[in-house]
Amino acid sequence: MATVGMNDVKNGMKILVNNEPAVITETEYVKPGKGQAFTRMKYRFIKSGRVVEMTMKATDDVEVADVVDTDMRYLYTDGEYWHFMDPESFEQVQADKAGMGGAEKWLKGEEDCIVTLWNGAPIWVQPPNFVELKITETDPGVRGDTSGGGGKPATLETGAVVRVPLFVNQDEVIKVDTRSGEYSARVK
């Protein structure tokens, strides 16, 4: 594997920490008046999402992770694995529940996703920013029940539950922001 010196470390770079891929989110090069220069950095583990801060000497090296972000199309799930296809090479990969990272609740089929591959296996799936899903179950909105502009829970066709405004009814298609898990708009 390739290594990089602390002078070449940048935000967004993918590195290996204890044989697990991580993304550098913050770096700060510090050169004190007395003593050796060092780099303070924060990184987020791709699989678990855990954020860690580390201080390294200027002479240290970090190992670059062999991680690739690939545009892929979600095909189907067989209950245990979620199957994705590269639209250019038609190569297929399958992700398990841990590799999905919670994205499975936004996917119904034929969505374009960004799949992070490490050693050829998917370790993280990023769904599209917005998806259109049908509401399968929600309580009817009661007229006049709007003091405070509240909302109500709605179950979507993929099993995800989001809060929707009172005027949205069952069997309607809504647009959901997958980054926050919030209702965005009704689809006509």
UniProtKB/Swiss-Prot annotation:
Listed InterPro entries: Elong-fact-P_C, NA-bd_OB-fold, Rib_uL2_dom2, Transl_elong_fac_P/YeiP, Transl_elong_KOW-like, Transl_elong_P/YeiP_cen, Transl_elong_P/YeiP_CS, Transl_elongation_fac_P
CDD domains associated with the record: S1_EF-P_repeat_1, S1_EF-P_repeat_2
Main location: cytoplasm
Domain of life: Bacteria
One Gene Ontology MF term: translation elongation factor activity
Alphabetically ordered keywords of this record: Cytoplasm, Elongation factor, Hydroxylation, Protein biosynthesis
Record keyword Protein biosynthesis present: yes
PANTHER family: ELONGATION FACTOR P, ELONGATION FACTOR P (EF-P) FAMILY PROTEIN
Described purpose of this protein according to its UniProt entry: Involved in peptide bond synthesis. Alleviates ribosome stalling that occurs when 3 or more consecutive Pro residues or the sequence PPG is present in a protein, possibly by augmenting the peptidyl transferase activity of the ribosome. Modification of Lys-34 is required for alleviation.
UniProt protein name: Elongation factor P
Source organism (scientific name): Xanthomonas campestris pv. campestris (strain ATCC 33913 / DSM 3586 / NCPPB 528 / LMG 568 / P 25)
Name of encoding gene: efp
